[in-house]
Amino acid sequence: MVNYTVKNWQGEEAGTGTLELKTAKPETAKHLIHRVVVSHLAAARQGNASSKTRSEVRGGGRKPWRQKGTGRARAGSIRSPLWRGGGVIFGPKPRDFEVKVNRKEKRLALRTALISQADNFIVVESFAEQFSQPKTKELTAALSRWGASPEEKILLILTEIPENVYLSGRNICNLKIIRADSLNVYDVILADRVIATAAALAKIEEVYGA
């Protein structure tokens, strides 16, 4: 269980709350999070790297010279992997890098990652109504008022991402905005500071709660 203070748009205390999520045992937490992160990064790979073997390279069907009598090393094809322009031995072929992790494990890892970031958590009130139009300067100033440094990697968790908020934040290089129901372990543990609205935390408990 994590107790937190809710801040308003001006950065002043506006309330308190608690976040209750079931986490992994300390002795297995690190291994579990590692597995889920590996799975997440593997799933992001395109896996379409492809090279040609000697049988796929154009040409090379004719024997370059006769087997015996020339004094040269025997050769059967100009596309041998030993030759320039030849095929590739054990080169990459299109493949699926998926590492299967059970959904229960993913959710447990995510809850554990969130609780592990408790010291870096900032909870704020919903602020979508503050952006009648995109304004990067306003969002940057708000992040500073809430206690986040511009040099920190910031993960901003919202229930919904209004267009004006998205447009205001997309040019802030260290900021990533994500929906509460689309969280992943990698983004959570990569962040130096996790900022979430109180409504987003309620959504997290609803979606990922044990």
Curated annotation (Swiss-Prot):
Gene3D superfamilies: 3.40.1370.10. Residues 44-77 are annotated as: Disordered. GO terms for biological process: translation. GO terms for cellular component: ribonucleoprotein complex; ribosome. One of the primary rRNA binding proteins, this protein initially binds near the 5'-end of the 23S rRNA. It is important during the early stages of 50S assembly. It makes multiple contacts with different domains of the 23S rRNA in the assembled 50S subunit and ribosome. Belongs to the universal ribosomal protein uL4 family. This is Large ribosomal subunit protein uL4. The lineage of its organism: Bacteria, Bacillati, Cyanobacteriota, Cyanophyceae, Oscillatoriophycideae.
